[in-house]
């Protein structure tokens, strides 16, 4: 399955919530009718079956983190092998992706932009350049913008924007040094209440 390259707001309207795919403190404004389907005359969304609700939730989370279907299923399988709650394990695995951590630290305005920074070798983890967006970051890992990339205007703009957002409690950030520490795995209470991971567990458990 190819990565979606179309209008970002269309995806948010399809899922009925802001997926934070566009840069900005909040991507959705009053002009975007989030409760209607995509299109100029988008109809209100029909009532979904239980399966439809579960599928939509999985699609929503997959799109938030920019994960393809096969990758997402692999994350779920890994989550089932870990101790503890499968749904929470899944979210922690997604949050631990390097591209997501770069986004959370404020070095990029979107996860897609963070993925590009990683792929272009602009990110260093524990002193070593890492160019695989899906690399898992572990507690106490130090993530830094590579020295020659620190002059990029988009990174400075992203940090300015991040200063207006609530900072993740599980990440320590030094904006001046363009460096951050992934202090711990996020707890469920740290993450969005708009995600119902149990629906995803129910979907894949069938």
From Swiss-Prot:
CDD domains: S4 (cd00165). InterPro entries: Ribosomal_uS4, Ribosomal_uS4_bac-type, Ribosomal_uS4_CS, Ribosomal_uS4_N, S4_RNA-bd, S4_RNA-bd_sf. One of its GO terms (biological process) is translation. Residues 96-156 form the S4 RNA-binding domain. GO terms for cellular component: small ribosomal subunit. GO terms for molecular function: rRNA binding; structural constituent of ribosome. Gene3D superfamilies: Ribosomal Protein S4 Delta 41, Chain A, domain 1, RNA-binding S4 domain. Keywords: Ribonucleoprotein, Ribosomal protein, RNA-binding, rRNA-binding. Belongs to the universal ribosomal protein uS4 family. Part of the 30S ribosomal subunit. Contacts protein S5. The interaction surface between S4 and S5 is involved in control of translational fidelity. One of the primary rRNA binding proteins, it binds directly to 16S rRNA where it nucleates assembly of the body of the 30S subunit. PANTHER family: 30S 40S RIBOSOMAL PROTEIN (PTHR11831), SMALL RIBOSOMAL SUBUNIT PROTEIN US4M (PTHR11831:SF4). NCBIfam families: PRK05327.1 (NF003717), rpsD_bact (TIGR01017). This is Small ribosomal subunit protein uS4. It comes from Tolumonas auensis (strain DSM 9187 / NBRC 110442 / TA 4). The gene is rpsD.
């Amino acid at each position: 399955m190819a990565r979606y390259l179309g209008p970002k707001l269309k995806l948010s309207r399809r899922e009925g919530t802001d997926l934070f795919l566009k840069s900005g403190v909040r991507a959705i404004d009053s002009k975007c009718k989030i409760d209607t389907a995509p299109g100029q005359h988008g109809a209100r969304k029909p009532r979904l079956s239980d399966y439809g609700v579960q599928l939509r939730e999985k699609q929503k989370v997959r799109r938030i983190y920019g994960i393809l279907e096969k990758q997402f299923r692999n994350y779920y399988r890994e989550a089932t092998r870990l101790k503890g709650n499968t749904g929470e394990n899944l979210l922690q695995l997604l949050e631990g992706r390097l591209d997501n951590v770069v986004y959370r630290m404020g070095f990029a305005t979107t996860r897609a932009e963070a993925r590009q920074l990683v792929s272009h070798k602009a990110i260093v983890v524990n002193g070593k350049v890492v160019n695989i967006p899906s690399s898992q970051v572990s507690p106490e890992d130090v993530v830094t913008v590579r020295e020659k990339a620190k002059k990029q205007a988009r990174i400075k703009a992203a940090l300015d924007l991040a200063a207006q957002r609530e900072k993740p409690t599980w990440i320590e950030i030094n904006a001046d040094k363009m460096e951050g520490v992934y202090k711990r795995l996020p707890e469920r209470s740290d993450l969005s209440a708009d995600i119902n991971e149990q629906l995803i567990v129910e979907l894949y458990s069938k």
